[in-house]
């Protein structure tokens, strides 16, 4: 596991790395209430679908562990927990992992056997089950990411028969590594595995405007891991593919997902769709890396995905550490500056939807799924229990 940790947890205490301060400053916020977790997620101090779900679940656990629930009867205790989970869900409704975690935890507390217990004993049993289920979400995520990395690298090896003389170059978008998960990562986890298996030549990461998760976070992770990498702006991808595909053996664009729906349409950070179109035009594989918890089999197509609109200031203003006259960086100072006329109108969707037609493979912890003869992705064999 990478030394980078977005989440530090022990029972009764949760700390979350403030990713808005990266790459210049490591600061952990203590998160002890649902309100603090909501603010942390909404402000994007933590981001990435798996990490969001983990933070929400663990924050509610810490809150319960520390005695926030004053209800006594079983029904009232469950009602209180439901209210906390419903509140946390609204922090990022696009992230299907969060919705899955909410449903799992609601089901967990309703499955606790309370017959013959006093109100106090029943309350203790319900809270204990909730906390243990939340902790299992954290533990399971790391195993999931390692498996995604292995399956993704295997699929690419099968496609390209990679040797020491034909190592591949890949591109990734946004941030899908240790900072977006409990560790290793999804799309960036595949890149890590490619590096570990001697299959990777180079990685490109996009800046990922307007919030710059690529330049602030992914570039930071790649440097930290010693992975050979280059940062490009989002608008450079087409030129890169045209001019350097053959020379650098650019083989794949690998992205994460906030939500994959039944037919394979994928919601991910804004800018993903354009990369998929460019990859298809240039004959480059386009891969989505996502845990099965991010697959929403109840939503038929991407047209039904709710897309969050972000605040206008993300496009018109930017924050960063101060660069001194000699070129050194003063990490003790952060300033916010305007980069556009503040009167300009702004359209700022946080995500876009990539149609399944542009996706070559969806990599999960259970295996890699490719399109069937009908041109759509089918997840029935991968997780039959979700189709009963």
Curated annotation (Swiss-Prot):
Record pathway: Amino-acid biosynthesis; L-methionine biosynthesis via salvage pathway; L-methionine from S-methyl-5-thio-alpha-D-ribose 1-phosphate: step 1/6
On whether Transcription regulation is a keyword of this UniProt record, the answer is no
Please list the disulfide bridges: none
Keyword Cytoplasm belongs to the record: yes
Q: Which leading EC class covers this enzyme?
A: isomerase
Tell me where in or outside the cell this protein is found.
Answer: Cytoplasm; Nucleus
Q: Which GO terms describe its biological process?
A: L-methionine salvage from methylthioadenosine
Q: Which reaction does it catalyse?
A: 5-(methylsulfanyl)-alpha-D-ribose 1-phosphate = 5-(methylsulfanyl)-D-ribulose 1-phosphate
Q: Name one GO molecular function term.
A: S-methyl-5-thioribose-1-phosphate isomerase activity
Q: Where is this site: Transition state stabilizer?
A: 174
| Keywords recorded for this protein, A-Z | Amino-acid biosynthesis, Cytoplasm, Isomerase, Methionine biosynthesis, Nucleus
Which one Pfam family would you cite for this protein? IF-2B
Q: What is its main location?
A: cytoplasm
Q: What is its EC number?
A: 5.3.1.23
Q: So where's the catalytic machinery, residue-wise?
A: 258 (proton donor)
What InterPro entries does the record point to? Answer: IF-2B-related (IPR000649), IF-M1Pi (IPR005251), IF_2B-like_C (IPR042529), Initiation_fac_2B_a/b/d (IPR011559), M1Pi_N (IPR027363), NagB/RpiA_transferase-like (IPR037171)
Q: What Gene Ontology terms describe where this protein resides (cellular component)? A: cytoplasm; nucleus
| Family listed | Belongs to the eIF-2B alpha/beta/delta subunits family. MtnA subfamily.
Concerning PANTHER family, the annotation shows: METHYLTHIORIBOSE-1-PHOSPHATE ISOMERASE
Query: What does the protein in this record do?
Result: Catalyzes the interconversion of methylthioribose-1-phosphate (MTR-1-P) into methylthioribulose-1-phosphate (MTRu-1-P).
Q: What is this protein called?
A: Methylthioribose-1-phosphate isomerase
Q: Which organism is it from?
A: Neurospora crassa (strain ATCC 24698 / 74-OR23-1A / CBS 708.71 / DSM 1257 / FGSC 987)
């Amino acid at each position: 596991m990478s030394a980078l940790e977005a989440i530090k947890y022990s029972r009764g205490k949760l700390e979350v790395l403030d990713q808005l301060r990266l790459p210049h400053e490591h600061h952990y916020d203590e998160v002890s209430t649902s309100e603090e977790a909501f603010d942390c997620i909404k402000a994007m101090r933590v981001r990435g679908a798996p990490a969001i779900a983990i933070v929400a679940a663990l924050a509610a656990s810490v809150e319960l562990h520390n005695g926030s629930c004053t209800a006594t009867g079983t029904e009232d205790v469950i009602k209180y927990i439901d209210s906390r989970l419903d509140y946390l869900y609204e922090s990022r409704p696009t992230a299907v992992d969060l919705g899955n975690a909410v449903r799992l935890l609601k089901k967990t507390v309703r499955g606790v056997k309370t017959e013959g217990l006093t109100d106090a004993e029943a309350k203790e049993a319900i809270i204990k089950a909730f906390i243990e289920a939340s902790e299992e979400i954290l533990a399971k995520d790391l195993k999931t990411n390692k498996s995604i990395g292995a399956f993704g690298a295997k699929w690419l090896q099968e496609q390209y028969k990679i040797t020491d003389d034909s190592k591949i170059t890949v591109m990734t978008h946004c941030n899908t590594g240790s900072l977006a998960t409990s560790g290793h990562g999804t799309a960036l986890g595949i890149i890590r595995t490619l590096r570990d298996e001697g299959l990777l030549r180079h990685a490109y990461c996009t800046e990922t405007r307007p919030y710059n998760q690529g330049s602030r976070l992914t570039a930071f992770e790649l440097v930290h891991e010693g992975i050979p990498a280059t940062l490009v702006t989002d608008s450079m991808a087409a030129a890169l593919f045209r001019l350097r595909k053959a020379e650098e053996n650019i083989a794949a664009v690998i992205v994460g997902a906030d939500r994959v729906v039944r037919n394979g349409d994928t919601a991910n950070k804004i800018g993903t769709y354009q990369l998929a179109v460019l990859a298809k035009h240039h004959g480059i594989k386009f891969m989505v890396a996502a845990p099965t918890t991010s697959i929403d089999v109840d939503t038929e197509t991407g047209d039904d995905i709710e897309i969050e609109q972000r605040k206008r200031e993300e496009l018109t203003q930017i924050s960063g550490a101060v660069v001194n006259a000699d070129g050194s960086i003063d990490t003790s100072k952060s300033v916010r500056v305007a980069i556009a006329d503040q009167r300009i109108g702004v359209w700022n969707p946080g995500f876009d939807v990539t149609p399944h037609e542009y996706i070559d493979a969806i990599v999960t912890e259970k295996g890699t799924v490719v399109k069937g003869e009908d041109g759509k992705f089918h997840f029935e064999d991968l997780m039959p229990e979700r189709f009963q």
